[in-house]
Amino acid sequence: MCKILCSTGALIGLPNNRNYKLLKPLSKELLCDGFEFMMYSSWYDKTDEITGFLQDTGLYTPVMHCEKHIGEAISKNETDEALCLFKINCNMAQEINASKLVIHLWDGITSDQNFQNNLRLYKELEEISNSYGLCLLVENVVCNAGNPMKHWLELAECYPGINFVFDTKMAAFHQQLELLYSEEYKWLWQDGHIKHYHINDYAGGYMEWEKLRSLPLGAGNIDFKKFFSFIHKVKYNDTFTIEATAFNQNGEVDTDMLNRCFENVRHYLKEI
């Protein structure tokens, strides 16, 4: 059965001082089926505190999103740092009973400019995540040299068992959403490589960096009716995460907006 998750990154950010303890009261207002826990770089000195908090609150967190600087370190060939941080993220995911671990295999200004670094290190990352009982998912992160679907293909050629998380916003940014439905990329769903989806809208054109924001469904130009028709066609029946930024500059969280997103996804899933 499909589960609709909320990214904790949609709730917790700099405007509310990345106060993870807000998750307890906010979770009571949200009509999602669980959460995708987003790790931040400022939390490495309190990992035990955070995992203990999540265990005590009993939040259902089947997915964890790695801290994004790991991908940047990989891109810069800072291998030791990347692996050290990745192991910390894996341990946290195991502690909060997540089964899926999302990673930005490339990130930052360096992005995919040195993609051979990212390609080479994947094998070790997968081995580490497997040792923690986690399914590692590589996201179709935006690029400033190549494009994510091309890199997915390169990764799959080297590592046939690789798994992915598909982000609708990231795909729309590169005008690659249609590739998901194409004959060229049908191997992604025929062979079950996509294990998770990030559902975000996008209101820009091709690679409009200033418009690269996580928007709620309906606030951009993505055809979600077509997307969910595809989801039905390929019989995908697993997890989705809503990531639309819900906090304002004062740190106040618009839970009503997120609940509308959850309801919209449920409507699409029932309608088809």
Predicted regions and their residues:
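N-terminal pre-domain/capping segments
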Residues: 1-88, 94, 130, 163, ...
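Histidine-acidic metal/acid-base catalytic patches
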Residues: 1-8, 17-28, 97, 124, ...
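Short loop/turn segments at strand-loop or loop-helix junctions that form parts
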Residues: 9, 65-69, 103-107, 201, ...
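Acidic-and-aromatic substrate-binding clefts and catalytic sites of carbohydrate-active enzymes
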Residues: 11-18, 36-49, 70-80, 108-113, ...
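Residue-level detector of anion-binding/catalytic polar loops
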Residues: 33, 60, 99, 135, ...
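Conserved beta-strand positions in the central sheet of alpha/beta enzyme cores
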Residues: 36, 63, 102, 137, ...
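Active-site acidic/histidine proton-transfer and metal-coordination neighborhood
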Residues: 75-164, 264
